[in-house]
Amino acid sequence: MAWAGNPHHKNDANRSIAWEQFATLTELDGVDFFSLQVGPRAADCAGSEVVSLEGQLNDVAATAAVMTVDTAVAHLAGALGKPTWVLITAMPDWRWQLSRTDSPWYSQVKLYRQDAGKAGWPKTLDRVKQDLPKRLA
């Protein structure tokens, strides 16, 4: 999982999700979560049950699935054909297009579009939490 993009990206404040919100995805029992987050936000998950793989993971292909915001992680996992869930803003980068839940670029990507405004992240995360047990069944 990765919850934040490059802090220098012009749209980072919109496309990244605060760890405190994103961490609600890890409340599912019986599932191990691993952080693919790099940079200054990698330490956000310290003290949680999420295992940080920063500097340890040599191959994203070794993951079962990836949940991420719109970052390079999404594109790498998508290009590798990994099942990838990308949480995108209501007005995302052009690559994700509008009104789609899939990606024309990556066949294994599912898009979770934010409801309008930052207040929409909790609703988006709720949709992911509802779908996650189905994905793992």
Q: What are the residue ranges of the model-derived segments?
A:
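Catalytic machinery of carbohydrate-active enzymes
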Residues: 1-137
